[in-house]
Every structure is written in structure tokens, then in C-alpha cells.
Amino acid sequence: MMTPAPIVVEVPGTRSDAINAMVRNKLTGLPVVRSSDGMLMGVVSRRDIFRNIGEDQLSLIMKKGCITIAPDATVQEAARIFSGKRIHRLPVVEGGRLVGIVTPTDVLKLVKDMKTTMTAEDVISTTCVTAYEGEPLTYTIPAMRVSDVSAVPVLDAHGNLVGILTDRDLFSDQMKDSEAIKELGIEDVGNLAGYRNVLPLFYSATEKYQSDDRLVKDFMVKDPMTVFSKTNLAEVAKLMVNNDFGQMPVHGTKDELIGMIYDVDVIRVLAGNPDE
């Protein structure tokens, strides 16, 4: 299930090293290894850089003492870690050295083919942060950062779901903000798909370039794909894997928005009873 010999970034290193590695490889996070001997030192994600945008040294940005798993661990063990800790990268370590990595998508591929009676409403467990379609991005983006979410359902004046805003949607004209891109040290500005993976960093570093006339409705995905509270988790997993979604809005029996379901929520179906 794991990806062997994953892409890494090394320490000593800089913020720009991590950002450019994410952009080139269309990733949102990376294991960090020591350049001298390849020992795992931590992990770094776009959110880590997002929270420490003024820091340049990778050793001060990355998460140290990260949770790891052994090569012979079971899928159930991995599922328990993902759902319990709500993390999105699980380094596989042997003798202190990185030998692979597991992500929620790897586990979701197993869930989509399983038979289960569990549904979306059985695993929704987090507070749902929403945005109003008419509010400026200068308000929404800091709110997303404080709430530590990468996607928000968007509502109209009547409380109806009209869209979803993710960090990948917050880009309109990369050349317009070329100076801000330089501030982040991004080299491969032509790699749009990879660039979108670090958009939270872009908007954090470039708040001084933002104006109040950029509204949520101009950047959101309209009429997003949703699931219902009674949707089977295998079907939710299939939708996520097939569409490269990390989260989806959930509707109730009266078609009202009741929350968001995340990949790490769906994985709970494989976690079993912690006492087993």
C-alpha cells in the first residue's frame, strides 16, 4: 500500500527548497530527511509553511517528532492513525530511515471496494466552517488559515449551498502577481497544477497585494459534487478517489448542509475498535 522511496526534502534546507519540491511534484507535503545520512527528521506541509510564512529555515518550519509507522504494520493500524490524528502523511520508517510513505488516498482505494453498512453521517465529527458567496477573499482567506481548513462550503443569503472554495481555486492570473511569487522563491511558475498545491502560501505571503473586490463567488466551484448523510462510505471513498477530492459537503434528509466529510473521516471504517 505504501509508496516506496518517496520524494523528500533535506535539512539543512530552506523554505524555498520545500516549496519548489512541492510545486515540481504536485504535492502538498513532504518527509524531511537529514542530508548526511538520510535519517527521518520530520515532515513539512504547505500548512506548516503557511503558519510560518516569515521563517526561511526548513528546520524551524517542519514538524519534528512526526508520527511514523513500520513496514509490517497493518492497514487497520494506519487507518487508526489517520482517523485519530487527522494527519495526511504517514512516513514508513525502518531503523530510523524513511523507506516509504502512506497517504489517506492509499487507504481510500481499499475502502471504495469494501462492503460496509456505515454511512457519511456515522463519521462526520468536525466543525464545519462556511463562507458567504459575497464576502471578500481578504476576509475568507485569513478565516481559513485560523480555522486550519483547506476548503469551505459557500452559502448564499438564504443559507443554500452554492459552491465550495478550496485553496486550489484561489488562483486567477499568476503573472499578475509575479512579484509575490518571487517572494515565495517559486522557480517553476509555469507548473500551474503544482503551483495550485501551495496556494495558501501564495495568499498568505501576498496579502498586501489583495483587494476587497475579489469575492468568494468569483473563485468558488459552483454547484459542487456532494454526498447525502445516508451515502455509503464505500461510495464516498469512490467519489473521492475518482475525483481527487479530499473533502465533500454533506446534505441532510431535507437537502440542508449538515457538514463536510474528509478523507480521514471515511478511513474510520477500516480503523475498527481500538481495543481489538
Which positions does each model-derived feature cover?
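Tandem CBS (Cystathionine beta-synthase) repeat/Bateman regulatory domains
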Residues: 1-276
